């Protein structure tokens, strides 16, 4: 009897591991709301664009992220203060609380909205967690897919 229970418990554990929910992302802290979409955004070499009204510290955080992605992906990303409809787009949304951000990832663009440096930093940290762990490396990482799952 004990052996049957033990085998059933092991089988249940194995089955539950195999039925992971693909409608989530693995980030900490987990966002208040996430809607996973089909497809992905190719981050390697994507341009980084920011609204001209962003403060210098926020622009520097964006430039640092672009530089790190360029380094590890081996594909250069440009950074500018021009309006854009493709690539990484960082805009100011003063209606959001200081540490809040919104992140909308489509196949053509990643739109980040925040009202402060803290919000932009948290959004960047979320995106880094969605990329391969090699995003934190110090050299080009061969054979990695630098994509972000489409979500909002």
Regions found by a protein language model. Give the residues of each.
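Bacterial Sec-dependent N-terminal signal peptides
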Residues: 1-26
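Acidic, contiguous N-terminal accessory segments
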Residues: 17-152
């Amino acid at each position: 009897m004990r052996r049957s229970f033990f085998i059933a418990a092991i089988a249940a554990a194995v089955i539950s591991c195999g039925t992971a929910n693909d409608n989530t992302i693995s980030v900490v802290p987990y966002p208040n709301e996430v809607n996973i979409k089909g497809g992905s955004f190719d981050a390697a070499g994507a341009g980084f664009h920011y609204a001209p009204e962003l403060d210098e510290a926020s622009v520097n955080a964006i430039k640092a992220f672009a530089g790190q992605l360029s380094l590890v992906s081996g594909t250069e990303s440009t950074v500018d203060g021009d309006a854009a409809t493709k690539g990484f787009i960082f805009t100011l949304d003063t209606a959001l609380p200081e540490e809040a951000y919104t992140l909308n990832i489509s196949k053509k663009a990643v739109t980040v909205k925040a009202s402060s440096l803290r919000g932009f930093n948290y959004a960047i940290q979320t995106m880094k967690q969605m990329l391969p762990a090699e995003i934190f490396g110090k050299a080009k990482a061969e054979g990695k897919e630098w994509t972000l799952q489409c979500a909002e």
